[in-house]
Amino acid sequence: MIMLKKYRLALILSPATLALASCGYATSGDSETPSPAASSPEATQMGPFSMTEHGSFNEPWAAAIAPGSDRIFITEKPGTMKFVDVSTGKLGTVTGLPDVDYGGQGGLGDVAFLESEAGNDATGRTIYLSWAEAGDNNTRGAVVGRGQLVCAAADTCSVEGLEVIWRQAPKVTGRGHYSHRIAFSPDEKYLFVASGDRQKMEPAQDASNTLGTVVRLNLDGTPAAGNPLAAQGSPSDEIWSWGHRNILGLQFDSSGQLWDLEHGPKGGDELNRVERGANYGWPVVSDGIHYDNDNIPNHATRPEFKAPAIGWTPVIAPGDFTFINGALFGDWKGDAIVAGLKSKALIHLGFDGGKVVEKARYDFDNRLREVLEGPDGAFYVLEDGDGGRLLRLTPAS
């Protein structure tokens, strides 16, 4: 039995920090000018972390650091995007964003950059975005677009030439389980996209569509050569793996292995090694049960389906995760940190001889949507919901 360290992080804020947290943004339009954040936010120490705030946001969903810069770009579900220069504390807006189908779990989704385009500023680099797109007859689906990020001033950037390069197929009714997380292979030859089951379940076992799959594409969104179902034609030729439910984390580790983190039903959240041609079993098997308490056979009953590396019952409701590549947190290097929504926690995972173990859980007062590692090794964490804050975590002194 693994003994877990568990910490309660009391988020007691100084007056200066409370003032910073009160600086919100308008909820509509992509041309609103946010108030600047304080340039030197005051740190609060708690548990193993020292925390500073870098602004608050309107339903933040994803964040990415423009490689080689100090700017973190943050998507907001209603269809807006902001950025923070963490070296100065200044906040800025991004224009040129797509129309999104906002509602339920849908809206503006992930944001990603290419590491090979690292520079000292964020001007003139490729930006990838995902979002929920409306279709005919009350249908909708996830899409991925690509454009150029141009920053004309310290507080303003725009996305130019944005075009959709991939669409989830087919569009269906409902506003859940888009997934639409983005990851690039370490050599930057391939674009991987998590495509959720859209709460329709059975299509995740039907390889004639891309619901409940991870797709592998060229950087321009066309199907990559060598995919396992290429002979079946479009859209099956996009599929890398299937039998997924609702993936909210998609990351490569330092060895080049792709992992996904996904929501189970009632129980059965999963961390999976994503492998070519693997079927992860949803909805035929799960280590959880249906919301109406009907049982689902677990993975042990059907060995032809790929079992998770680790699962959680009760659920943690993951928002995202990141691998720890820096040395700032000492022997945590090579481990992973998960942002928990329902669990309101950061979950520390270790990798031991091919096994994944939960090493510790650090409780917060709010749902956590996103976590990423900065170039200096600090963790940047986004709280979920309206007014969700961006928190920078370093080891407590």
Regions found by a protein language model. Give the residues of each.
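Secondary-structure boundary elements
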Residues: 184-190, 217-232, 251-257
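Repeat-solenoid scaffold signature
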Residues: 235-270
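Surface-exposed loop and turn segments in beta-propeller and other repeat-based domains
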Residues: 92-106, 160-178, 219-240, 282-313
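Beta-propeller blade signature
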Residues: 142-153, 207-220, 274-275
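Bacterial N-terminal signal peptides that target proteins for export
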Residues: 2-12
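Conserved blade-ending motifs and adjacent loop-strand segments that build the rim/top face
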Residues: 244, 355-375
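C-terminal motif of bacterial Sec signal peptides marking the signal peptidase cleavage site
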Residues: 20-22
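Acidic, Gly/Ser/Thr-rich repeat motifs that build Ca2+-stabilized beta-propeller blades
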Residues: 24-29, 34-201, 249, 257-260, ...
